[in-house]
Amino acid sequence: LVTLQAAYSMSALNRGLLPTGGKSQSLSFEMTVPGSQLEFFRVNYSGQIFFPLTRLFTLRLRTDLGYGGTFGGTETFPFYKHFYSGGMGSVRGYESNTLGPRTTRSPNDQFGEPDPVGGNVLIEGSAEVLFPLPFVEDQRSLKAAMFVDAGNVFNTNCPDISTYCLDLSEGELRYSAGVSITWITGFAPISFAIAYPFNRRDGDESEVFQFELGRTF
């Protein structure tokens, strides 16, 4: 497939690692050439902003939004372009990339668990209060946070036979709250989080303690 792509990004953060002020955002767009075998488009926006509350405390707001659609003779958005949600950097307290629509269980497989398949709509947001840890000499390399996360992925074109497909609905957003620590080491950033998913539904895969290597704010 021949695709057309465009992207925009800007950063006005006060520092590259563990910022305490400023903002950053990025926007990407992709679409296939009209007349292609598959005709679809995909747009994704990510943004974050930091508000210093006091000398020690900072409020961070983050959002990640995505939408994929079709045009021409294509009716279904391709699964390999789906968005995923859950995990570190997303909705903590849920296992990575497990939220949202799932495969429909086969009549011959009554005991297997449906697999996450993502969706063509992504909605995520976070609010965090960042603060230093006491008795830490270099505060620029270690930061703690109290956070609330919300989000999910959805499918706006659910097949009639699907039993685990989530259409766009505010009531299907998942929420979590917890604490996290990010440490900038000489090897790579290390992040830990303890999160409580407080509206977990049947079938959701929760994960209270999470760890990730290589991600900062």
Predicted segment positions?
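In a subset of proteins, long, contiguous C-terminal domains/tails are tracked
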Residues: 139, 173-217
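C-terminal outer-membrane beta-barrel translocator/porin domains of Gram-negative envelope proteins
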Residues: 1-142, 146-166, 203, 211-216
